[in-house]
């Protein structure tokens, strides 16, 4: 009895096997690419967070040093404002001894008078109190795209300064790295109880604001 040879066409099976193989490779490749993309995004997110944290730390240190008199110049505190009064009680403000750039820009003669006027009424003096007029601290261009930091400065009737800093101009409570700096004033008074010297140098460390 002769054997009947049956020729089977395996090309279809080969094509199916090939398609399954490429499908598996495609899935694996997709998983690898997705994992790489996720890893790259995670790495970029980490870098972004580091940059934001660095921007905040730098701004906080700058404000603490320049407004708080932390940087002593020639062995003396760098934020000292002197006030004199004439016979009519009119005040004159001497800011010549201010050495820090932010100190010089903040403690102008007119602003000093406004702060003391608010103090006389038992009120806070606030600079940058709303989202539309926040102080803005821009990092130098060579800093590589660091985020700007927004600030608000409050001087209370005891002349203590509170600086609030945020990466969000609206000061959202959940904004990362919100920071508060408290700077203590050491004022001097004359015999009539009037402020004659406003001096800073005992600032407390900057603290991250708890949400």
Q: In which residue ranges do the predicted regions lie?
A:
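Aliphatic-rich helix starts adjacent to a transmembrane/signal segment
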Residues: 4-6, 10, 16-55
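N-terminal alpha-helical signal peptides/signal-anchor transmembrane segments
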Residues: 52-71
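Alpha-helix boundary/capping detector
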Residues: 32, 45, 58, 69-70, ...
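Conserved functional hotspots that engage anionic ligands or polymers and/or phospholipid headgroups
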Residues: 2-4, 13-17, 65-211
């Amino acid at each position: 009895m002769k054997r009947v040879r049956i020729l089977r066409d395996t090309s279809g099976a080969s094509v199916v096997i090939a398609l399954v193989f490429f499908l598996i490779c495609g899935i694996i490749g997709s998983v690898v690419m997705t994992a790489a993309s996720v890893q790259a995004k995670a790495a970029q997110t980490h870098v972004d967070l580091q940059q934001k944290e660095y921007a905040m730390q730098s701004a906080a240190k700058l404000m603490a040093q320049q407004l708080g008199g932390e940087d002593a110049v020639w062995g003396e505190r760098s934020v000292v404002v002197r006030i004199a009064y004439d016979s009519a009680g009119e005040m004159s403000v001497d800011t010549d001894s201010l050495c820090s750039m932010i100190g010089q820009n903040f403690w102008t003669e007119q602003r000093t008078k406004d702060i003391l006027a608010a103090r006389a009424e038992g009120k806070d003096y606030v600079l940058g109190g709303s989202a539309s007029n926040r102080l803005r601290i821009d990092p130098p261009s060579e800093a590589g795209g660091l985020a700007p930091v927004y600030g608000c400065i409050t001087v209370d009737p005891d002349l203590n300064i509170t600086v609030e800093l945020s990466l969000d101009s609206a000061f959202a409570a959940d904004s990362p790295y919100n920071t508060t700096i408290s700077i203590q004033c050491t004022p001097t008074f004359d015999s009539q109880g009037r402020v004659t010297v406003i001096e800073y140098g005992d600032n407390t460390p900057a603290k991250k604001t708890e949400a």
